Structures are given as structure tokens and as C-alpha cells.
């Protein structure tokens, strides 16, 4: 009765289970505690987001001129919207360039 078992099928099942557990183990490494938003401090020391401050806004723009996503900058959703609006206004008023030339 044991002669009828397909060994190739068992080997592939072992490989699948090992791969799945390896993926789970790797995922645990990437779950890190998220830091708070750098633009919203509870004690009131957070910078004010305005289009008049191109130095602050340029920290949230990539090298090619795009607005960096919130998952990269750790900015909360409401502050990300304010940043995007301020960057767009600053671009229209020529305080920030639309595209950075290399």
C-alpha cells in the first residue's frame, strides 16, 4: 500500500509549506512600529504648513519634483492633504519648481 504513494507530490507539498512559513517569518520582520506624524506635535511645536515656506515644503518633494507619499514621510492624512495643497499653490506662485532638472 505504501508503494502507491507519489513521492514527487509529497516533495512539492513540503516545498509549499516551507515557502509559506518562510514568507510568514519574513513578514514579521517588516512590521515595525510607526512613528508619529512629524508635522503634528501635541505640545504645539509643530511647524505651520503654508505655501510661503518653500524650505519646509521642499523636504516633502522627491528629487524629480513629485510629492512624496505619506507612507514614506510618516505624515498623517490631514497634514498630507495640507502639504499637497501648499505645494501646488507654491508651484503656481513660482516659489517651488514644477520639475527639478538634473
Swiss-Prot record:
One of its GO terms (molecular function) is small ribosomal subunit rRNA binding. NCBIfam families: S18. Pfam families: Ribosomal_S18. The lineage of its organism: Bacteria, Pseudomonadati, Pseudomonadota, Alphaproteobacteria, Rickettsiales. GO terms for biological process: translation. Binds as a heterodimer with protein bS6 to the central domain of the 16S rRNA, where it helps stabilize the platform of the 30S subunit. One of its GO terms (cellular component) is cytosolic small ribosomal subunit. Belongs to the bacterial ribosomal protein bS18 family. Part of the 30S ribosomal subunit. Forms a tight heterodimer with protein bS6. It comes from the Bacteria. The keyword Lipid metabolism does not apply. HAMAP family: Ribosomal_bS18. Gene3D superfamilies: Ribosomal protein S18 (4.10.640.10). Keywords: Ribonucleoprotein, Ribosomal protein, RNA-binding, rRNA-binding. This is Small ribosomal subunit protein bS18. InterPro entries: Ribosomal_bS18, Ribosomal_bS18_sf.
Amino acid at each position: 500500500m505504501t508503494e502507491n504513494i507519489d513521492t514527487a507530490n509529497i516533495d512539492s507539498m513540503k516545498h509549499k509549506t516551507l515557502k509559506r512559513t518562510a514568507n510568514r517569518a519574513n513578514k514579521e520582520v517588516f512590521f515595525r512600529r510607526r512613528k508619529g506624524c512629524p508635522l503634528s506635535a501635541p505640545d504645539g511645536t509643530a511647524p505651520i504648513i503654508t505655501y510661503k515656506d518653500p524650505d519646509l515644503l521642499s523636504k516633502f518633494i522627491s528629487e524629480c519634483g513629485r510629492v512624496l507619499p505619506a507612507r514614506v514621510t510618516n505624515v498623517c492624512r490631514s497634514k498630507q492633504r495640507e502639504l499637497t495643497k501648499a505645494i501646488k499653490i507654491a508651484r503656481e506662485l513660482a516659489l517651488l519648481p514644477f520639475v527639478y532638472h538634473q
